[in-house]
Amino acid sequence: MAIQKAKFSIGDFVKHKHFEFRGVIYDVDFEFNNSEEWYQSIPKNVRPRKDQPFYHLLAENDEITYEAYVSEQNLLMDDSDEPIKHPLIEEIFSGKKGSSYFKPSN
């Protein structure tokens, strides 16, 4: 299998193409790396391909914050510059610039 190149980077603000939520990327899997049970729980008509990057997000919608695992094909860049209001942001990132967060330099 060819190595996949990720379209998005850690710290980028993204939004889902089909569902009303947005988030910040905190990790990337260059191909699907979750359980088969999780994958099969996605309705077949919207189930993404496994051979693409999948992103771990600190996500939010109008009601709650949560963590999400989303395929690249279902994400768009979110250039709103509005901060993500997730309680784990400060544990992972050290600052914000435009529509992305950055990690502390060690």
Q: How should these model regions be labeled?
A:
Residues 12, 41-46:
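Intrinsically disordered, low-complexity boundary segments flanking structured domains
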Residues 47-106:
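Intrinsically disordered, low-complexity, charged/polar segments
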Residues 25-26, 37:
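Short amphipathic alpha-helical leader/targeting segments
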Residues 27-29, 59:
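Residue-level signal for short segments within beta-strands and strand-turn junctions
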Residues 32-41:
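Short, solvent-exposed secondary-structure boundary/capping segments
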Residues 22-24, 56:
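Generic detector of isolated residues embedded in canonical secondary-structure elements
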Residues 1-13, 18-22, 29-32, 103-106:
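Mixed-charge, Lys/Arg-rich low-complexity intrinsically disordered regions
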Residues 1, 36, 45-47, 79:
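Charge-rich, low-complexity amphipathic helices
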